Swiss-Prot record:
Belongs to the AB hydrolase superfamily. Lipase family. Residues 381-403 are annotated as: Disordered. Residues 392-403 have a biased composition (Acidic residues). Gene3D superfamilies: alpha/beta hydrolase (3.40.50.1820). One of its GO terms (cellular component) is cytoplasm. The lineage of its organism: Eukaryota, Viridiplantae, Streptophyta, Embryophyta, Tracheophyta. This is Phospholipase A1-II 2.
Length: 403
């Protein structure tokens, strides 16, 4: 993949790579999909925990503790925390039952990572990744967010000042741009946390060939769409130390199961950004990508798959099955089009589709929702009492300037 990275990241708008689906592109998409899955695996979703809404692991240990194929290829450099206005907060953010929790008004929403030396050698460049956490829930969350559109001019730079006033979903924009000066984790908006870190990494690696890849699933896909447009529109893909911003890193968004983010004006502004590409993976039976149904437009190049053709999955799967990220990755591994059958070109373990759901056909001896932390992170102490230990403190919680 190292010699083809520009092609795989959309330099030619993926012409000739989608039907049939290129095997290197399959592997590339699965790698990024696993990096999104890391946000689900590491998120503390237990309401009773005082750490609910936080990340379970330290940045230094993240890729070693989650299920990714290449844990040595990237290092997490910053965690992202997001809050939102009252109309959105209770619908998509988790609040711990314990009011002493640190994430009572915000949630961990992902991370920024950069390719290590090992990863840069394998990938052909120094790749900077922004991974946004989404939701594995099906239709109810996106249907709940029936909010009016809001102007996207603030994130589109000059492209947003052309008189067309492009608009995006107010709820997604709120998650991306809201801050809380009373929060130790969200004094900066998620937007500024990411842009500040991107700028730092672009300066740090100004003498190397770099790329910026923004990834997400479901709700995270909408945030990735906003973030990728923001980076390209406001020239965060250049180093402030390079004369005249002469070196511009390509920005690519890779999203799975994405709802629509903005209107036609936003779509047109997105497509005019010369350094920006987007590949949107859609599973045909998934209804989430059709929301909101009116007034919004699809963005980027679509890769359509249909996991109903897989012989490994339940024939009449649930709505959550069609939206499940692991099922999307299963589809990427084996999809050959409507009339070519289904065969796993990439040897991806079918047991993974039952990690957080009940998707695998009954003849396979794999328990449903088998990804459970040992004893749900309850640890027996020397005094014989059990206590919850589900969070490793991270320097990023307190120090915004850590390298």
């Amino acid at each position: 993949m190292a010699s083809r990275w520009r092609e795989l990241h959309g330099s030619g708008h993926w012409d000739g790579l989608l039907d049939p689906l290129d095997v290197d592109l399959r592997r590339c998409l699965i790698t990024y999909g696993e990096m999104i899955m890391a946000t689900y695996e590491a998120f503390i979703g237990e309401h009773r925990s005082p750490n609910a809404g936080m990340c379970r692991y330290r940045r230094a240990d993240l890729f070693r503790r989650v299920d990714v194929s290449h844990p040595g290829w990237y290092a997490a450099t910053r965690y992202i925390y997001a809050t939102a206005n009252a109309d959105v907060h209770g619908k998509v953010l988790l609040r711990p039952l314990c009011r002493e929790g640190r994430a009572t008004e915000c949630n961990w929403m992902g991370y920024v990572a950069v390719a290590t030396d090992e990863g840069a050698a394998a990938l052909g460049r120094r790749d900077i990744v922004v991974a946004w956490r989404g939701t594995q829930r099906a239709l109810e969350w996106v249907a709940d967010l029936k909010l009016a559109p809001a102007s996207a001019a603030g994130i589109l730079g000059p492209e947003g000042a052309d008189g067309t006033d492009p608009s995006v979903h107010r709820g997604y924009l709120s998650l991306y741009t809201s801050e809380d000066q009373c929060s130790e984790l969200n004094k900066q908006s998620a937007r500024m946390q990411v842009l500040t870190e991107i700028a730092r990494l672009m300066d740090k690696y100004k003498d190397e060939e770099t790329s910026i890849t923004v990834i997400g699933h479901s709700l995270g896909a909408t945030l990735a769409t906003l973030n990728a447009a923001d980076i390209a529109a406001n020239s965060y893909n250049t180093s402030s130390l390079s004369p005249s911003g002469e070196t511009r890193a390509p920005v690519t968004a890779v999203v799975f199961g994405s709802p629509r983010t903005g209107d036609r004006g936003f779509r047109d502004a997105f497509h005019r950004l010369r350094d920006l590409r987007m590949l949107r993976v859609r599973n045909r039976p998934d209804r989430i990508p059709h929301y909101p149904p009116v007034g919004y437009a699809d963005v980027g190049v679509e890769l359509l798959i249909d996991t109903r053709l897989s012989p490994f999955l339940r024939r009449h799967g649930s709505e959550s099955q069609s939206h499940d990220l692991e099922c999307h990755l299963h589809g990427v591994a084996g999809w050959h089009g409507d009339h070519r059958g289904f065969e796993l070109v990439v040897d991806r373990d079918v047991a993974l589709v039952n990690k957080f759901d009940d998707c695998l056909a009954d003849e396979y001896p794999v328990p449903v929702r088998w990804k459970v932390h040992h004893n749900k992170s309850m640890v027996k102490g020397p005094d014989g009492r059990w206590v919850l230990q589900d969070h490793e403190p991270d320097d990023d919680d307190d120090d915004d300037d850590d390298d």
